[in-house]
Amino acid sequence: FKLTPYFFSYTISKTGLYTLTKTSAMSLSPNIRVNGIAPGPTIKNKRQSEKHFKKQYLATPLKQQVDVNEICNAVDFFIKNSSITGQVLAIDSGQSLNWQTPDIIKGKE
């Protein structure tokens, strides 16, 4: 996940998901498996214009919005594979690889 001081809510939610998933998996095993999904641009939020949302997903390497069915498929994958625990799967069209935050745009990274 891309840690960035420009989007605190994103950074806190993704690192929180990651840490909660890992520590819960350690704490609850072997009886309970814990995995997480870190989605990218899937659904436009209430404060976002359609134009801004489109700009967001077009800035990903795959240049596409995440389909909700892909997230459902990931849940199904985790359910069907009993040897997986403590993993977070980024279904984000590659957003976490090169999210175009100001530090990237200005060439600071």
What are these regions (language model features)?
Residues 60-71:
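A conserved structural motif in NAD(P)-dependent oxidoreductases
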